[in-house]
Structures are given as structure tokens and as C-alpha cells.
Amino acid sequence: MSSPAPGKLVVVGTGLIGGSFALALKDAGKVGSVVGVGRGRDNLDQALRLAIIDRAYTRDEGWTAELADATLVLLATPVGEMPALFAAIAPHLGPGTIVSDAGSTKQDVIAAARTTLGAVLPRFVPAHPIAGSERSGAAAASASLFRGRQVVLTPLPETDPGAVERVREWWTQCGGIVTLLSAERHDALLSAVSHLPHLLAFALIGELAARSDAADYWRVAGTGLRDFTRLAESHPDMWRDICMANAVRLRADLAAYRQQLDRIDAMLASADGAALGALFARSGAARAAWLPGRRGGGDVD
């Protein structure tokens, strides 16, 4: 049996993720009304114009009065903002209101929830939709963003199973493929396959931009640099918070990556083309196995 649709959804953070969640539920006819909460009036006004939300509040406009009869509160903000938001909502939530988030790290978010949510904690279902874009804001929201994408739930031992099932159903109605993981396993996996690639893209663009002749590099750069560094246009505040929150695991992955670079450097220094070619072949085969039916464009440049 399907879970009841949220009668009222309160979304804190009406950007790409929060806005797309609201649009997807609206598109599926699975939500009554949507209240949007944000830091800036301009983005909220755009969300209203695009019919992503039905009512809007900035964070200093008494939005917590909307929480008492909300079915679901989704926190779709940078993870560094979660502790203050948990503290702000806890006293105002209704007895049946479910709380969830869309943060890219989970252990830090859960730790903050444990210290602030009190009796609400069993109705908190941590979540991470693994979908996104380098674009941000309400204008980037899309009802189709989560279709066919992984959504990871990391419930606590004390999380109400009924709340987990309802959140699972709502993400499924958005088109997501829902998986359950521990918070620890989630953060370890996402460090390697998401957080590290973002960090590398930021680092490479930052290093090239700092060169005195950077304009010459941009002039001859092609699809290789463009595709590798697309992530460098991602929201800087959000990714700062993610990297800081998952710093221990991310540093371990950076160390492993440095070791791989050192091995490659040794191959170059010793003119060991056979070893380098073998590494490239293994990497290409691994990517092809991960993404069958796709062919990369790395040879275009």
C-alpha cells in the first residue's frame, strides 16, 4: 500500500534539490501544498513564479508557524546549516511531522540531529538523493531530476520504521531508486566517488587559474578539461561544508590518490610506457564495466 501523500511539505532550501523534490511530487500529484523557506527573497520569488512552491518565507519571517501541521519537513541546505536548522524546527514540529534532509554527508548530520531534535529524533529519516548538477537555485529545479537516480536513506537504530517507509515511498514517487545504508558506509563510499572528484575539479581549475599565463591555457583547452572540471562550477558553500564534514575519510582518499599519482610519476620518470598503457587499459575497462553501453570522449582532444 502506498504511503499517504504529504498534505503539506515544508522545504527549507528551494534550490536544485529541494525545488526538484517539490516539483516531482507536484508532477506526480502527490503533495497538497508546498511551503518554501530560504535565505534570499529573489530565489524564493523565482520559486513562486515557477510554481515550485505555494508560499514563501525568508528565514526571518516566522516560517516555523508552518511546521505544526506539516506532513514532511525537508532540509535541503548545505550540511553546515543543519545544526541551527534542527534547533530552529524542533520546538515547532507537530506530533506526526516527519523530518528528512538531503545532505551529501550523513554522520555529521545525524550527530547534529541527536543533540537537538529530542523527542522528534525517531521521526527523522536522513536521506541523500545522489543526483545533481553544477547549476543551483530554483531555476535549476526539474521534476525529472531524480528519475532513475539512487537515493540513499541512512536511518538511525531508533528511527520509526513507518517514517522510513513513508520517506522511501515519497522518493520513489519522485522516480528515485531507494537504498538503505549505514551513515558510516554512505560517507565512505561518497567520499571516493563524489567528494574526491569535486575536490580534484576545484583543485585543477584553481591551479590553472593561478598561473600568470592562464589565458593561454583556456584558449587551447578542449572537451577534456571541460568535462573533467565541470564540477568546479558547483555551489562553493555546499561543497566546502561537505568536504569539511567528511574530512577524515576524504583525506584518506586523497592519500590513496596521491599514491596512484606517485606510481604514474614513476612510470613517466622511467619511461615505462608498457606499465602506463596497462594502467590506462585497466582504467578504461573498469569504467566500461561500470557504465556498459557508453563510450567516453577522452580521445577527442
PLM region spans:
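Interdomain hinge/lid region at the active-site interface
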Residues: A214-S283
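Rossmann-like NAD(P)(H) cofactor-binding subdomain of soluble oxidoreductases
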Residues: L85-A139
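Internal alpha-helical scaffold of NAD(P)-dependent oxidoreductase catalytic cores
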Residues: A143-R230
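Rossmann-like NAD(P)-binding element
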Residues: E61-L93, T97-I98
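Long, positively charged, glycine-interspersed low-complexity recognition regions
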Residues: A288-D301
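NAD(P)+-binding Rossmann beta1-loop-alpha1 motif at the extreme N-terminus of oxidoreductases
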Residues: M1-L67
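Glycine-rich, N-terminal phosphate-binding loop of Rossmann-like dinucleotide-binding domains
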Residues: A76-P78, G103, P155
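Residues at the starts of beta-strands that form the adenosine-phosphate
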Residues: K8, S33-V34, R123, Q150, ...
